[in-house]
Swiss-Prot record:
Gene from which the chain derives: nfyb-1
Organism: Caenorhabditis elegans
Subcellular location: Nucleus; Cytoplasm; Perikaryon
One of the record's GO cellular component terms: cytoplasm
Compositional bias of kind Basic residues: 393-403
BP terms from Gene Ontology: negative regulation of transcription by RNA polymerase II; regulation of gene expression; regulation of transcription by RNA polymerase II; tissue development
Oligomeric and partner information: Forms two NF-Y heterotrimeric transcription factor complexes: the nfya-1-NF-Y complex is composed of nfya-1, nfyb-1 and nfyc-1, and the nfya-2-NF-Y complex is composed of nfya-2, nfyb-1 and nfyc-1. Interacts with nfyc-1; the interaction is direct and is required for the interaction with either nfya-1 or nfya-2, and subsequent binding of the complex to the 5'-CCAAT-3' box motif in DNA.
Tissue: Expressed in certain parts of the gonads with high expression in fertilized oocytes in the uterus and mature oocytes from the distal to the proximal arm of the gonad, but weak expression in the syncytial ovaries and immature oocytes at the beginning of the proximal arm of the gonad. Expressed in secretory cells in the pharyngeal terminal bulb wall, in the small ganglia surrounding the pharynx and in the neurons running anteriorly to the sensory organs in the head. Not expressed in the intestine, the hypodermis or body wall muscle surrounding the pseudocoelomic space.
Lineage start: Eukaryota, Metazoa, Ecdysozoa, Nematoda, Chromadorea
Identification of the protein by name: Nuclear transcription factor Y subunit nfyb-1
Start-end of Polar residues biased regions: 330-348
Superkingdom as given in the UniProt entry: Eukaryota
Region of interest (Disordered), ranges: 318-403
Keywords, alphabetical: Cytoplasm, DNA-binding, Nucleus, Repressor, Transcription, Transcription regulation
Length: 403
């Protein structure tokens, strides 16, 4: 059976079937006021529909991907002028770049939907990269964003790191990214501020010049509590909270610090050196003081006199905190060895290593015992004198006389 011929009128009829009727354009529509129902879809849903369209909807390559000429032009800037690109290489780079942009944009739109915002900022894109696993690119892009804002004198919102973001191993020892500052007619400004609404609007009469502490890279604290301080972490440390806060009240000539307990405090631990630091709020910002962790606790007592405090050691000794007395000079092990007459290497093999405290207390007793032992061992032994060597003359045979 021959197929039924299809004319142009049937194609037009089939094409127009199912198309919505054209709505009349009113005067309100011309003025920009549309009498339509409010779209209840979120930004993320719209972005996902654009990223994953329906199968029945035909989406052209010009709408899905970036222009291939622009992609090739960017690729050739990093290549030899005589080099050529294959067709599959151009299409591969075009699709990869387009999919990456769509993927990051959809995640940033979801973040804006959660925070009930309509404007996607550069910080939202960085947060989206942190959330989707592009950890190696998030921190370098944030440094670039800070320098870009400083060069163009732009102030943006404070960056909020995604909760699932973990710094890559190559960035563990690097300091955290701090905001940069630039000069304006109104004074010194920072590249990050909290007086930003929807990514572009800045609150009027905001104290932008007094918001940040440029030396410490932290937000200043005002007495009225309008904004609180959010310090940037100075180094990769672990934060530990304890129930007692220690406030510095006095410091002596040797650098020892007396502390007073008040409320809570924060302790930072350096994971590399295992050094503990106590955080202290000062007019210049947060300062870190190194702490010494000991196995046994020390008791600090108040006494009268020039030495205000006395520390009771576990072995029963009392050390004055002021240290007004002269400390005894430790005896070096080399001087003891010279008195004994032994080799330093043999002395180290026979005697185990003692601690610094034991060496101060017992070095004199060890010296006397070793000297007595050496005197007993080195008793002179009589040795018989060696007879003098006598020279033996060889026997001479008589020579024959000539007749």
């Amino acid at each position: 059976m021959d197929p039924k011929p299809i004319n142009e009128g049937m194609l037009l009829e089939d094409h127009d079937h199912g198309m919505p009727e054209e709505e009349e354009i009113t005067e309100d529509d011309m003025n920009g006021i549309h009498n339509i129902e409010e779209d209840t879809r979120t930004i993320s849903e719209i972005a996902m529909e654009l990223h994953h369209p329906n199968k029945s909807q035909v989406l052209l390559d010009q709408e899905r991907f970036l222009p291939i000429a622009n992609v090739v032009r960017i690729m050739k800037t990093q290549m030899d002028p005589q080099a050529k690109l294959a067709k599959d290489a151009k299409e591969c780079a075009q699709e990869c770049v387009s999919e990456f942009i769509s993927f990051i944009a959809s995640e940033a739109a979801e973040i804006c939907n959660i925070t009930k915002r309509k404007t996607i900022t550069a910080d939202d894109l960085l947060t989206a990269m942190e959330a989707t696993g592009f950890d190696n690119y998030a921190e370098p892009m944030r440094i670039f964003l800070q320098k870009y804002r400083q060069a163009h004198k732009i102030t943006g919102p404070i960056h909020r790191t995604h909760p699932d973001y973990v710094r890559p191993p190559q960035f563990q020892m690097d300091p955290f990214v701090r905001p940069l500052f630039f000069d304006t007619e109104q004074g010194r400004r920072c590249t990050e501020t909290q007086y930003v609404i929807n990514g572009s609007e800045i609150v009027k009469n905001a104290p932008l010049g007094e918001e940040w502490n440029e030396q410490t890279g932290t937000l200043n604290t005002r007495a009225d509590g309008y904004y609180m301080e959010e310090p940037m972490e100075p180094m990769p440390m672990e934060e530990v909270e304890i129930e007692e806060h220690e406030e510095i009240i006095e410091q002596d000539s040797l650098g020892a610090i007396a502390l007073e307990q008040q409320g809570q405090m924060q302790i930072y631990v350096d994971p590399k050196t295992k050094q503990h630091f106590a955080a202290k709020e000062t007019p210049n910002g947060m300062e870190l003081y190194p702490l010494i962790i000991q196995d046994t606790p020390l008791q600090l007592e108040n006494v009268s006199g020039p030495n205000q405090f006395v520390m009771n050691m576990p072995d029963g000794r009392a050390i004055p905190h002021g240290m007004g007395q002269e400390e005894p000079q430790p005896v070096s092990s080399s001087s003891v060895m010279r008195k004994i007459g032994q080799n330093p290497s043999s002395y180290a093999q026979q005697h185990h290593h003692v601690s610094h405290v034991e060496q101060h207390d017992d070095v004199e007793y060890e010296e006397e015992e070793e000297v007595d032992q050496v005197e007993e061992d080195t008793v002179p032994v009589p040795i018989a004198p060696r007879p003098a060597a006598t020279r033996v003359q060889p026997k001479r045979t008589p020579t024959k006389r000539k007749k």
